[in-house]
Amino acid sequence: MEINAHNKHLCHLTAASCKPLAIDEKKKAMSEIIEYRPINEDERIEIDQLAAKGLVLIGLQESAESSAILDGIKNYLNNFESSDDEEITDRAYELGSLLGNTIQKHYGWNWFCVEENTDDSFHCVASNKERACCACHEYIYSILTKQHSNNVKLLFNMIKKDYPKEWHFMLLS
C-alpha cells in the first residue's frame, strides 16, 4: 500500500498502516494514472504541518533559503541510521513534504493527488503543465530504506522550466 492510499475518492496523507512504495515500483505505476487533481485544503494543511516538522528535524526556520533546506535534507538523510519502519515512514512524510514545498516555492510547481487504476493514490509535486513530477514522499522513503542513492540536491538542480510535450506526470527521481 502506498503512502497515502486507501480511499479512491480521498487522498489521505498519513495512515499508520501505509508505507510509500519503492521508487522503482512507483515508476511502473505512473503509466497507470486514471485521475489526478490539485490537493485540497485539508491536504495542504497536513503537508505544511509535516514540512514544518521536517524543518525542525534539520534545524531550520521556514524563512531558510532553498539551498540551506536541501543541504539540511541531504545531511539528515546521510546520517539517518534507523531501521524502524514507523520512524522511516514518519521521516519520509516530513522530509518529503519539506522537499515538495521547497520545489513548489522555488520552481512554482503544484501539489497533486494522483489516483492509479490499482485503487491506490499518492501525492506529488508537478510542473505547471503536469509533464514532470516528483513523488517526494516515496523518493525520500527510497533513500531512507537504502533503495536509492541520496541525490536530493542533484534532482532539485536538474528541474527544468519545461519538458517534452508528450510527457504527462513523468516521474523524476
Where are the language model's segments positioned?
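A recognition module on extended beta-rich or small alphabeta surfaces enriched in W/G with H and D/E
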Residues: 125-173
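Short hydrophobic alpha-helical segments enriched in small aliphatic residues
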Residues: 5-10, 25
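N-terminal low-complexity, intrinsically disordered segments
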Residues: 26-89
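Amphipathic protein-protein interaction modules
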Residues: 91-145
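Short secondary-structure junctions and interdomain/linker hinges
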Residues: 57-61, 80-87, 102-105, 110, ...
